[in-house]
Amino acid sequence: NISLGKHVQINLDCTIGHDVVMEDYATLAPGVHLSGYVHVGKRAYIGTGAVIINGIQGNPIVIGDDAVVGAGACVTQSIPPGETWVGVPARPIRK
């Protein structure tokens, strides 16, 4: 149950779990891991080796439109639109 929008870019060695939605122009850098129940917004960028921990049915982890996830980050909660998050666990550095 994966849904991909227009012009989505998925690089080498990425893993995409169940019930994932990727909206238009979203990008996964190499080595990204999306667990189940993840929603990636329009134009969102997920950096190399980042991990998005799974959400739950009816309450996915949402990476907002135009959000950026830094390389190697571990995302454990939803990220609002337009924000940049980095680190383990991921935290905002720019809104």
Label the predicted regions.
Residues I2-G87, R91-I93:
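Structural signal for interior beta-strand "rungs" in well-ordered beta-sheet cores
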